[in-house]
């Protein structure tokens, strides 16, 4: 039975639940407040700490530039507050639809898509010229082609408007964190594995830098490095290839040559710079609010065991056995006092088919360790809906990799975990029973705690971002460091 003990509370990991994707529909209507209220009351009774919700750019600013309509979201936030839950708000600058689990379609605003009609290079583009309309290419971050605004200015204005319009919920400390969307699915990555273009697991994916803006950027960078003859890769295969069938990723392939390394560094640095610039804007927008900023990094666990890490490389994570592609991201986030939110916490290597050379457990261990080494908080979520004890136990293990400490804070502890996602299936009786046990175990057998200070999570007013970290300093974090050791299983099993 859950109790309350001061030392054990320091092991408490809060649990949030992701709301359904279409809770506010594409027409900016809060469809079923009564139905949602019933569900939120059940979550609160189960001891859940809060919920996470996508705040869709394509809904809020759909009528025209700077024409924001926050009314439906205000009603939603009001309801969450009445139900006694906290809120994690995602600034969702991507399209909903086309990714794993997308059951509704919410495009980016029509006035932006209209600009894309005459200038399709505003979208990420693969080598064969297919455009991906889920998110604007980083190539237009600083191009004032959106009725005089740059992409970064659009994101910045949106966040400022959110702060102004949601000030009551920021003041009341309902909103505890702002997840800043930085790419497709809200993740800091390229759309390298789009299902709507025919990608299927475990395809290696494709590089997405062939729009004219990124092409020009690459050519300028290559010329500056004294190699004006270098072009973007033309030997990296297509979405559903295996690494060995491509010249780029095969053993001793292009990825290991001077040209290949130059390209991969440029490609991954684009994301670092993109995340850094937008987090800086988010920091300015929410300065002084009692919130944490967070970014999401995708769990690309397939081909992790291959020397080439092909699927990670096409997504923009330049991670090899002798080069850490994640710690530089954590270092960049540290400048903004942010949280790194990672996915696939529920997955075990033994559940994966061997031909995908997949290693989710090692990947989670590497990314979380990298965050902790850079002295930032790390949070996470499951990638796919699961309702079984094995998955819950794996999440609990990752939340406290070295178990609980009965005398104080544990050596390692995640900042929070968000369960994906609220549904009728989750609330089905036997599923919900085990979920309730999961919440209690995440809380280290303690009762639900309303005061985050008791588990060392007091949130001070957001301070200004630290000084800019030069890219060479960020890249020092590519030196591999051994991850922290993980226990083989959790000491707080839901079925133990």
From Swiss-Prot:
Gene Ontology process terms (BP): polysaccharide catabolic process
Signal peptide: none
UniProtKB keywords: Carbohydrate metabolism, Glycosidase, Hydrolase, Polysaccharide degradation
Gene Ontology molecular function, alphabetical: beta-amylase activity
Pfam families: Glyco_hydro_14
EC number: 3.2.1.2
Binding-site list for substrate: 54, 94, 102, 296, 301, 343, 382-383, 421
Active-site residue list: 187 (proton donor), 381 (proton acceptor)
UniProt-listed InterPro entries: Glyco_hydro_14 (IPR001554), Glyco_hydro_14_CS (IPR018238), Glyco_hydro_14B_pln (IPR001371), Glycoside_hydrolase_SF (IPR017853)
Reaction equations catalysed: Hydrolysis of (1->4)-alpha-D-glucosidic linkages in polysaccharides so as to remove successive maltose units from the non-reducing ends of the chains
Family to which the UniProt record says this protein belongs: Belongs to the glycosyl hydrolase 14 family.
Protein name per UniProt: Beta-amylase
Organism the protein comes from: Trifolium repens (Creeping white clover)
């Amino acid at each position: 039975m859950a109790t309350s003990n001061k030392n054990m509370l320091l092991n408490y990991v809060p649990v949030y639940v992701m709301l359904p994707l279409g809770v506010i529909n594409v027409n900016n209507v809060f469809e079923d407040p009564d139905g949602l209220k019933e569900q939120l009351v059940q979550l609160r009774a189960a001891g859940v700490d809060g919920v996470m919700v996508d705040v869709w750019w394509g809904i809020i600013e759909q009528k025209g530039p700077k024409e924001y309509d926050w009314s439906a979201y205000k009603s939603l936030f009001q309801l969450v507050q009445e139900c006694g839950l906290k809120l994690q708000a995602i600034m969702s600058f991507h399209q909903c639809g086309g990714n794993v689990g997308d059951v509704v379609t919410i495009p980016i605003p029509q006035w932006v898509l209209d600009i894309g009609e005459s200038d399709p290079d505003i979208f990420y583009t693969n080598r064969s010229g297919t455009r991906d309309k889920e998110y604007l290419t980083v190539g237009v971050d600083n191009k004032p082609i959106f009725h005089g605004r740059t992409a970064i200015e659009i994101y910045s204005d949106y966040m400022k408007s959110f702060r102004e319009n949601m000030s009551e919920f920021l003041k009341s400390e309902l909103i505890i964190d702002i997840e800043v969307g930085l790419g497709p699915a809200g993740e800091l990555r390229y759309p390298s594995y789009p299902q709507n273009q025919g990608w299927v697991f475990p395809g290696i994916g494709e590089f997405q830098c062939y729009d004219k803006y990124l092409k020009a950027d690459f050519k300028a960078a290559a010329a500056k490095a004294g190699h004006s003859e270098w072009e973007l890769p033309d030997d990296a295969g297509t979405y559903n290839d295996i690494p060995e069938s491509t010249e780029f990723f095969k053993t001793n392939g292009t990825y290991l040559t001077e040209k290949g390394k130059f390209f991969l560094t440029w490609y991954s640095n684009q994301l670092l710079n993109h995340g850094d610039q937008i987090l800086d804007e988010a920091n300015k927008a929410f300065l002084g609010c009692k919130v944490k900023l967070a970014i999401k990094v995708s769990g690309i666990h397939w081909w992790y065991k291959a020397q080439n890490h092909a699927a990670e490389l096409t997504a923009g994570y330049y991670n090899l056995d002798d080069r850490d592609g994640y710690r530089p991201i954590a270092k960049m986030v540290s400048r903004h006092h942010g949280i790194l939110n990672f996915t696939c916490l529920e997955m075990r290597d033994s559940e994966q088919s061997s031909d995908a050379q997949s290693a989710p457990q090692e990947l989670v261990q590497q990314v979380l360790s990298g965050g902790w080494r850079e002295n930032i908080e790390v949070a996470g979520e499951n990638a796919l809906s699961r309702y079984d004890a094995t998955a819950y136990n794996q999440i609990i293990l990752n939340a406290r990799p070295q178990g609980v400490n009965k005398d104080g804070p544990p050596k390692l502890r995640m900042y929070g975990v968000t369960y994906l996602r609220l549904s009728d299936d989750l609330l089905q009786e036997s599923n919900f029973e085990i979920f309730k046990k999961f919440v209690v175990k995440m809380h280290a057998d303690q009762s639900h705690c309303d005061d985050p200070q008791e588990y060392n999570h007091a949130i001070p007013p957001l301070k200004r971002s630290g000084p800019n970290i030069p890219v060479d300093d960020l890249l020092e974090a590519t030196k591999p460091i051994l991850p922290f050791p993980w226990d083989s299983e959790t000491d707080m099993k839901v079925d133990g």
